[in-house]
Amino acid sequence: MIKRDSVYEQWQSAAQSGELDYHVFRKEQPDEQLEKLNRALFEGFGFSQKDLVGKTVVDIGAGSHLRTRFFQGAKIVAVEPLAEEYLDKITWCELNAADVVYPLTGEERINDLDGTADLVVCINVLDHTYNPAAIVENVEKYLREDGQFLLSVDLHGETLDGMHPVELTDTSLADMLIEQGFTIDQGYRYLSHRRSYGHGDALTFIAHKRRPGE
């Protein structure tokens, strides 16, 4: 008997096709107003545009709108499973602005990224995945010893709409970070300019790799 992971099947059959449909047919091209909101988002997290000049930012689940372009002068590495489809079907796709693009899921380990990232960003992504713990485990490997992890995601308890295969809570996310070797520096609900990315409540953690003695 073949036993399949129902969460993975939902992600593969519904979530990814839904994401592709949204980005190709319904997502508006980024404009000045969206870039203003994106700046407000990162500044609300405590970052400025020049913080990572000459450093490496890894964007997990980057989508078609490359939020991490916010970091001027940084090397941007995008990890996006639908990258090839976005680049082929969306004329304005901002993945073209990334220095490197891996058309892979966040769950897949990319050995070339081990120990390279000064900052890993994962925004409005984890609730759309099939194995969040594997992603967090990979992020811990990708970070330099003094690197940071910015994780921000909507909590909404919705797993039956096809687009959100996993249910996340503030407790489960905090436990996941701690179990995968992180120390949490900041954690809070809501965003600086709105309650969530889409629905529910946004939860954000900023963390670093656990150091000896922590």
Predicted regions and their residues:
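Conserved class I S-adenosyl-L-methionine
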Residues: 150-174
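Short amphipathic alpha-helix with an adjacent loop that forms part of the alpha/beta core around
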Residues: 48, 108-115
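Short catalytic micro-motifs in class I SAM-dependent methyltransferases
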Residues: 124-125
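Class I SAM-dependent methyltransferase SAM/SAH-binding core
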Residues: 58-109
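Core SAM-dependent methyltransferase catalytic element
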Residues: 180-182, 186-214
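Class I SAM-dependent methyltransferase Rossmann-like catalytic core
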Residues: 1-51
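A conserved beta-strand element that flanks and buttresses the S-adenosyl-L-methionine
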Residues: 121
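A short glycine-rich, Lys/Arg-flanked "PGG" loop and its adjoining helix->strand segment in the class I
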Residues: 133-148
